[in-house]
Amino acid sequence: MFKRTALILRRCFQPTFIRPHHINVLENFKEADDLPNQGQAKFVDVSIHDPQHIRSALVSPMQRKFLQDLEQQQTVRIKWFKEGNQDELENMKNECRRLALEIIMAAKGGDIKKACKELAEKEKCKQIELKKKCKELEKKTKCAKKDPCKKKDPCKKKDPCKKKDPCKKKDPCKKKDPCKKKDPCKKKDPCKKKGGDLKKKCKKLAEKEKCKKLAKKEKMKKLQKKCKKMAQKEKCKKMAKKDKCKKK
């Protein structure tokens, strides 16, 4: 029950267990939280001076056992400070707090309920802070890490009703870059000349040729009709001559 308490109780106890002594134990909780930094090489003097004199004054065997545990934990504490095992030290602090509360409750001294409530509130506050930090880290990791294998949906189609703005105009204030050089290897489009677009001209010429062909066809048809009429007239004349000759 009284093991691992050297981190909190840095001073020797009074010869007998009395109520003011247990109240002083609660004051030492605050000092236990103020641990030295890892970079500091100095260690707190936790040695128990003249333990034989104190043991002779203590009558209870539980008190003697408590001092023996302090002597044993003195060497362990120094080793932990040298090695820098902070996680184990924090676990030791929590256990020592629990043991000190048990000592106070056993001695029936001090306001136990208030001390228990304060410790419970501190632990709750620490847990709430840890949860907040964890949530913030999760959000940061989600934003930082995106799925590289995620691709766009190939089945996603463009809106067919979406049209370009026909009134979109060029910037009249936009100027050409004087330092920009022309590409000497770039060839001009033969269909684009100063005289205009050749494609349009070709279309016009083709239409004209079609019109000419149609006109020729119409002329030929008219000539054919005339020729037929002339041939019929000649036939009629010949027939009339033959009839006259027969009558004579």
Curated annotation (Swiss-Prot):
Offer one example of a GO biological process linked to this entry: spermatogenesis
Keywords from UniProt, A to Z, are: Coiled coil, Mitochondrion, Nucleus, Repeat
Q: Does the keyword Translocase apply?
A: no
Known tissue expression: Expression limited to post-meiotic male germ cells. Expressed in elongated spermatids during individualization and in finally elongated nuclei of spermatids. After completion of nuclear shaping it is no longer expressed in the sperm heads with the onset of individualization.
From the UniProt record, list the sequence repeat ranges. Answer: 147-152, 153-158, 159-164, 165-170, 171-176, 177-182, 183-188, 189-194
Localisation per UniProt entry: Nucleus; Mitochondrion
Q: Where is this region: 8 X 6 AA tandem repeat of D-P-C-K-K-K?
A: 147-194
Region feature (Disordered): 146-200
Query: May I ask which residue range the UniProt record assigns to the signal sequence?
Result: none
From the record, give the transmembrane residue ranges.
none
> Coiled coil located at which positions?
82-147, 197-244
Q: Name one GO cellular component term.
A: nucleus
Q: What does this protein do?
A: May be involved in the final steps of mitochondrial differentiation within the flagellum.
Q: What is this protein called?
A: Sperm-specific protein Don juan
Organismal lineage: Eukaryota, Metazoa, Ecdysozoa, Arthropoda, Hexapoda
Gene, per the UniProt record:
dj
